[in-house]
A protein has these predicted regions:
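N-terminal Rossmann NAD(P)H-binding glycine-rich loop of SDR-like oxidoreductase domains
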Residues: 4-24
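Conserved Rossmann-fold NAD(P)-dependent oxidoreductase catalytic core, especially the SDR/UDP-sugar
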Residues: 82-129, 137-139, 145
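Conserved beta-loop-beta element that borders a ligand/cofactor-binding pocket
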Residues: 134-156
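Substrate-binding strand-loop-helix patch
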Residues: 156, 184-191, 210-230, 277, ...
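Substrate-positioning beta->alpha
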Residues: 159-165, 178-201, 208
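Mid/C-terminal beta-alpha module of Rossmann-like enzyme folds, strongest
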Residues: 199-252
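Conserved C-terminal active-site "lid" loop/helix of NAD(P)H-dependent oxidoreductases
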Residues: 246-273
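Amphipathic terminal alpha-helices
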Residues: 278-305
């Protein structure tokens, strides 16, 4: 049986991946900082450690052997080195890292994996840190796979995005939307993402990076009106002319007003799972969860709403 370590397991992506792998019969350990309760069973061991404290990681990781490591919580090169400097490489077949589309130097359309990486003013330090973590991994001998997704949504999302629209529409409140530049974005449903991650274990390719998203192109109106259709209410949209206001769109909107779509031909050509859940289907499942759980969330950047 394959032995697997998931770095993460208590938040949105890590918990969804853990639940998927447990359901499929894999033997997994999870490593979290222990601050959040784990709401599922079936893992072999729960390792509790702050991965940013190097000595603690050395104590808990040294000598452990895994066939596959899924790293869902690596944000800096230090996060990576605190793991791979101590983990045993004896059995390791793949180190699978969740990076981000934010590593690309330019935001735009149809971005391919070979596009230049670098600092992007839209993503700031987050994207640059992810890029530096990638570079550290690529320059190491570890058998890596790097995943670069677009916007991830779904049940248990810890970012206040689709839930914000659900709340506004339910309450018949106006939704301010940036107007000016017409942009298109891509989204990937969490259920699709974890299937992509699982498929990596079964695929022969190694030391590769992949863009991961559903190829469907979505405008802000598409996103908001789809939410309204699912709820059964007409959204009330108030367009904000970006040329007539001095504040940036992130102060009143949960996304940056930029094009963000990636080319996934490499993913397809290499035989990995292809995301196929369209926006309406994924948001329908998400809203069902949202209605049952009513999470209380906010976005500190959205201070002009």
């Amino acid at each position: 049986m394959k032995s697997i370590l998931i770095m993460g397991g208590s938040d949105f992506i890590g918990s969804a991946l853990a639940k998927r792998l447990i359901k499929c019969g894999y033997q997994i350990d999870i490593l979290t900082n222990g601050k959040k309760e784990i709401d599922y069973n079936g893992f072999k061991e729960h390792l509790i450690c702050d991965r940013k404290v190097r000595k603690d990681m050395e104590n808990i990781i040294t000598g452990r052997k895994y066939d596959y490591i899924y790293d869902m919580t690596a944000y800096t090169k230090e996060d990576v080195s605190n793991l791979i400097d101590f983990i045993s490489m004896d059995n390791l077949k793949k180190y699978i890292v969740l990076s981000a589309g934010a590593v690309y130097k330019d935001s735009g359309r149809n971005i391919k994996e070979e596009n230049e990486k670098g600092e992007n003013e839209n993503w700031g330090k987050y994207g640059l840190n992810k890029k530096e973590a990638e570079d550290f991994i690529i320059n190491s001998p570890i058998p890596y796979i790097i995943i670069r997704p677009t916007y991830i949504y779904g049940e248990n999302n810890n970012l206040y995005r689709e839930y914000y629209f659900f709340e506004k529409i339910e309450k018949n409140e106006k939704i301010p939307v940036p107007k000016g530049k017409q942009v298109s974005n891509q989204f990937i449903y969490i259920g699709d993402l974890v299937k992509v991650l699982e498929s990596i274990m079964k695929n022969p390719h190694v030391r590769e990076a992949y863009n991961v998203t559903n190829p469907q192109l979505i405008s802000w109106d598409d996103l908001i009106y789809t939410c309204g259709e699912i709820i059964g209410k007409e959204p009330i949209i108030k367009y904000v002319d970006m040329e007539k206001v001095e504040f940036r769109e992130r102060t009143y909107f949960p996304f940056r007003n930029i094009d963000f779509n990636l080319d996934i031909n490499k993913l397809i050509e290499h035989g990995l799972y292809i995301p196929n859940v369209l926006l309406k289907e994924g948001l329908t499942a998400t809203y069902k969860w949202f209605s049952a759980n009513k999470p209380k969330m906010h976005d500190r950047k959205m201070n002009k709403v």
